[in-house]
């Protein structure tokens, strides 16, 4: 019996997880590598050790516009992995935003804390260079799902021209940054509903984390997203400076002094896709190298899911 084709996937966000699940279900051997401490990518969550509070400091909600992701959302909702929140058709993940990605990757070979620094390919297949460990295996195919500039750097690490012709679209992708601020506060902040969207100024949105499904009884805590313009203007400032500035902006917005019991800022350099690659995925059939992500279809979790699934279908057909 022939061994199943070996596929390496770089990135354990929604696009990588979607591709991994499709390929694994089709009978291929999948290995996922991610530099983060946990899976999820920008569907990120952080648990404060002192308070035990969970903060979704990246993507906040999931929405479905097309049938494929709607079917997946319905299945997750039936199993308690997502639940309606904030507005009709909008879902939060339970217990945090990594849950859908963790579900897709369940039972698969996943390596976190592994930074892929280079790629090589010869007649035998693909090899990965890792910053933290050695990886001796040779893979039959390779899927890249990091933000487009990071994927482009990996492709550039190869011999000139290798696998590059089909990936010019990576240079079309553009992103806006976002500073995220996680706050635990003594009492619920005085704004109506679960999400505050001022419409102007440094703050794009404030999300009432303690009101999310599955967090009943949690102490008051919020996540604040700065506007793309403010984030770009302050991109290289220290987290401490950003914390102070955004806390002051929130206090001014609400007309009150805010004394958080916990605060932490996180910078997302590639937060929001503002220009796409112009295709559902990028693929070089001769090299068996593909790229998927929200950079292909737009700034939504659904776009990352659809892109990863579409690339997986194409790759599965080639490997069959």
Model-derived features: where do they sit?
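Active-site substrate-recognition segment that forms the wall
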Residues: 182-234, 241, 245, 249-254
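A conserved short coil-to-beta-strand element within the FAD-binding core of flavoproteins
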Residues: 112-126
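Glycine-rich FAD pyrophosphate-binding loop
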Residues: 24-49
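N-terminal FAD cofactor-binding segment of flavoenzymes
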Residues: 44-83
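N-terminal Rossmann-like FAD-binding beta1-loop-alpha1 element of flavoenzymes
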Residues: 5-33
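Central helical "cap/lid" subdomain
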Residues: 40, 141-193, 256
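Flavin (FAD/FMN) cofactor-binding core of flavoprotein oxidoreductases
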Residues: 251-287
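Short beta-strand to alpha-helix junction loop
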Residues: 61-68, 82-105, 236-245
């Amino acid at each position: 019996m022939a061994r199943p084709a070996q596929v390496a996937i770089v990135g354990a966000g929604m696009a990588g997880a979607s591709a991994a699940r499709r390929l694994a279900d089709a009978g291929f051997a999948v290995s996922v590598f991610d530099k983060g401490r946990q899976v999820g990518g920008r569907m990120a969550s952080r648990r404060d050790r002192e308070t035990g509070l969970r903060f979704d400091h990246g993507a906040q909600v999931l929405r479905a516009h097309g049938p494929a992701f709607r079917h997946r959302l319905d299945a997750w909702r039936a199993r308690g992995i997502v639940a309606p929140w904030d507005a009709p058709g909008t879902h939060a993940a339970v217990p945090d935003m990594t849950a859908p990605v963790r579900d897709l990757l369940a039972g698969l070979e996943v390596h976190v804390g592994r930074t892929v620094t280079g790629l090589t390919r010869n007649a035998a297949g693909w090899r990965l260079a890792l910053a933290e460990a050695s990886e001796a295996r040779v893979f039959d195919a390779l899927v890249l799902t990091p933000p487009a500039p990071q994927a482009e750097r990996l492709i550039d690490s190869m011999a000139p021209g290798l696998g590059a012709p089909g990936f010019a679209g990576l240079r079309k992708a553009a992103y806006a940054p976002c500073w995220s601020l996680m706050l635990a506060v003594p009492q619920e902040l005085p704004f109506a509903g679960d999400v505050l969207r001022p419409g102007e100024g440094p703050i794009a949105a404030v999300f009432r984390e303690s009101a999310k499904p599955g967090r009943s009884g949690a102490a008051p805590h919020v996540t604040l997203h700065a506007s793309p313009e403010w984030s770009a203007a302050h991109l290289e400032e220290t987290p401490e400076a950003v914390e102070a500035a955004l806390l002051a902006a929130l206090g001014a917005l609400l007309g009150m002094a805010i004394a958080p019991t916990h605060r932490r800022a996180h910078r997302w350099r590639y937060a929001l896709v503002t220009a796409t690659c112009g295709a559902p995925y990028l693929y070089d059939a001769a090299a068996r190298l593909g790229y998927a992500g929200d950079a292909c279809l737009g700034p939504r979790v659904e776009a990352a899911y659809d892109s990863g699934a579409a690339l997986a279908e194409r790759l599965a057909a080639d490997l069959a």
